[in-house]
């Protein structure tokens, strides 16, 4: 039997704390779509199922714990970061889904100029990363129109391309490795 919206919210609050669970109705409506349905957002006509909550993940452990809960409770999860996608991939397909927002995981953990690599979290803004690597005489080589606001998790998830992709390749050509959480075991592992 499916959990009620109230039960889902209470479960999430117990996992990540109340401050990290958004239940504001307007925010939930806007979280049911991405930029593909800009008309709906502008005119407030939302036709997609509304999620139960938006969870602001602050750590990989938050992601692990929320996915364990969702998998055990059979709740759909939509992962997002910068909310700039235009592919329809951020839309909720089932009512009372969980939108798992990684934008708070925004640390640049390491820049290695020698190997020309950076280790970043999913919520790092591409422009912020570009500004940091330029201090070392480097570039990300990735320049989509959403560069000022797009975040790494979404760029990788959508196989982003940009103005210099014919020279540097798409984002998938720039990723050396990543850590992912995989249900149903909900384990963290590098890929």
Question: Where are the predicted features?
Answer:
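Residue-level detector of anion-binding/catalytic polar loops
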Residues: 74-76, 139
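Short, basic and Ser/Thr-rich N-terminal targeting/leader segments
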Residues: 48, 71-73, 80, 150, ...
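Glycine-rich, histidine-containing beta strand-loop boundary motifs that form or position
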Residues: 25, 79-83, 102, 122, ...
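N-terminal flexible segment immediately upstream of the FAD-binding catalytic core
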Residues: 1-68, 85-116, 168
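FAD-binding subdomain of flavoenzyme oxidoreductases
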Residues: 106-191
